């Protein structure tokens, strides 16, 4: 998926709250929007290089969105709206082997008490619900989710288990927005209940996928499956 807007490089200064950050752009301090409510503390450190996307809404208080940051030499996407777009592109291009037979792709569909990112159907009208989680927390090539407690994430997993029990397909895909990683695990230290729910989902035959991404300053796309350690 190519970024379809003007991308600028800046230097990160600080993040006063979840939604905003201060950066230096063209030698001036500037307030920008952060489209990610996660902590991202291991990424957004003072002095790191970040990518800004020009906003399309006129007269915005924050003219740019902070969408990615360099952690050393590695570029990590942090825009929480991007993972769904990347997965949708991968579904259309048949990059996720287990889901290649699902040609009807619908976004943001409700089942039970949850709204899921995708509802898929094949030519025989078999139905599959898919939830997407963007992953940015990485250390020594190993990635984890979540980086902050997520009651909503646990709720999604439990709903996927119920969908599976009703005879439909159900899966969760962890889109790791980094390319040089080799392992994914739930972050039990931060949110043990999420990890418990994910292990229960595996036991109940909910599909669990983890893929890394090719991330550049021009585009991001789903790359390869990553080992999952529960």
Swiss-Prot record:
Top-rank taxon, per record: Bacteria
UniProt GO molecular function: DNA binding
Pfam families xrefs: SfsA, SfsA_N
InterPro entries: SfsA, SfsA_C, SfsA_N
Family under the similarity heading: Belongs to the SfsA family.
Protein name, UniProt field: Sugar fermentation stimulation protein homolog
Species for this entry: Clostridium perfringens (strain ATCC 13124 / DSM 756 / JCM 1290 / NCIMB 6125 / NCTC 8237 / Type A)
Phylogenetic placement of the source organism: Bacteria, Bacillati, Bacillota, Clostridia, Eubacteriales
């Amino acid at each position: 998926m190519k970024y379809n807007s003007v991308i600028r490089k800046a230097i990160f200064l600080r993040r006063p709250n979840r939604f905003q950050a201060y950066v230096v752009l063209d030698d001036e301090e500037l307030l920008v929007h952060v489209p990610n409510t996660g902590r991202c503390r291991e990424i957004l450190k003072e002095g790191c290089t970040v990518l800004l996307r020009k906003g399309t809404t006129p007269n915005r208080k924050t003219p740019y969105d902070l969408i990615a940051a360099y952690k050393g030499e590695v570029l990590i996407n942090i825009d929480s709206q991007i993972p769904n777009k990347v997965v949708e592109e991968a579904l259309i291009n048949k990059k996720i082997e287990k889901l290649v037979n699902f040609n009807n792709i619908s976004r943001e569909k409700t089942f039970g008490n949850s709204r899921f990112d995708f509802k898929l159907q094949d030519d025989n009208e078999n139905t599959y619900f898919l939830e997407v989680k963007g992953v940015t927390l990485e250390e020594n090539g190993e990635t984890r989710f979540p980086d902050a407690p997520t009651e909503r994430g646990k709720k999604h997993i439990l709903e996927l288990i119920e969908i599976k029990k009703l005879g439909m397909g159900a899966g969760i895909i962890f889109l790791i927005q980094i390319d040089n990683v080799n392992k994914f695990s739930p972050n039990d230290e931060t949110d043990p209940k999420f990890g418990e729910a994910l292990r229960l989902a595996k036991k109940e035959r909910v599909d669990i996928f983890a893929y890394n991404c090719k991330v550049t300053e021009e585009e991001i796309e789903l790359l390869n499956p990553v080992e999952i350690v529960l």
